[in-house]
Amino acid sequence: MRKDETDMTNIPVTVISGYLGSGKTTLLNHLLSNRQGKKIAVIVNDMSEVNIDSALIQQGGFSRTEEKLVELQNGCICCTLREDLLIEVEKLAQEGNIDFIVIESSGISEPIPVAHTFSYVDEELGIDLTKFCRLVTMVTVVDANRFWHDYASGELLLDRQQGINDNDSRDIADLLIDQIEFSNVILLNKIDLIGETDRLSSINFYKNSTQKQTLSTAALAGLI
């Protein structure tokens, strides 16, 4: 049975962003193992990158029948898959049995286009996601141990063979800043791997990037 549109507007959406290796998947596993009975729909770019903890499946904490795991293929969620994202979110919302939607962006995704998807009316597809759900949180996971190395590298994504295609001229530093600036929650991960001086300077840097964010520190290898 489908919920009416009034009910469907209550479906909150969280987008998880962060550069490759920052800890997005570990955070996702943590959310799934602490969902407090909520039914969560997960949308990802590449299911092979997500690697949902097998223990969650064995313990019944996650299953493809109880929750929805949707894979978007052949591109970066921020650039080439907006149409796919629109269709999948609408489909999940209309099914009426989802409490929360979590979108894990690709490590090379910029958050802004993903966020715009939830305020964008696609007249060609006839989809208006504001009728079904609301974007509540933009989370960016930052690898505190590698951030400054990546930021100061001067490399392009293509230099690391991480570009979407051969024409992807994006700079890694610019991508990192985009992911930080367009978020309202920053999770500073692997904080245990850096010294106190670096820790304080990193925290000050992220806090000064914008005045809107909640900044949390964590060591995702242990407990968030």
Describe each model-derived feature in a short phrase.
Residues 2-5, 161-224:
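C-terminal accessory "lid"/substrate-recognition subdomains
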Residues 2-170:
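Nucleotide-state-sensitive switch-loop elements of NTP-binding domains
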